[in-house]
Amino acid sequence: MVELAEYARTEINRIGGYYAYSKELINGDSIYDFDVTKLSIHTRDIGLAGIEVYDLLRDEYDIQAEFGDLGNILAYLSIGDRQREVERLVSALAEIKRRFSRDKSTLMDFDYIDPIVAMSPQEAFYGEKESLPIRETAGRVCSEFVMCYPPGIPILTPGEQI
């Protein structure tokens, strides 16, 4: 399975515009190792957000990736996957690039936004709550996790100022 994963990375990187990282990132300092069965594929260089590629793979090619975010998709290889499945993924990614790629300058630039922590998560979660429409929450303190799924990464957490 390791050989199949490395083959997938090589073929995906040959398409151009995608980057499926491999062992070149291991530096012994901040990155020690990674799960080779997970294909993390950067998509922004073809002008598409990861979630867009995720949706296209699912809707147009019947390929279910694990998740997509602003700049990447994550796909797993399992013991049930063979060369044929990898070839389907690589072909789909190549066709997505050909059919749907656009100027990457149109993508939203995302910078990390430091949250304003107004109180501890415990205080916010267990404190008194009020349910409001999202448009009326500016300046309030979040009391629950707010996230999109997939991938399930919090946008707001308890205690953060909205």
Label the model's feature ranges.
Residues M1-Y7, E85:
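Structural signature of PLP-dependent enzymes
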Residues N13, A20-Q161:
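Conserved C-terminal alpha-helix-loop-beta "cap" of PLP-dependent enzymes
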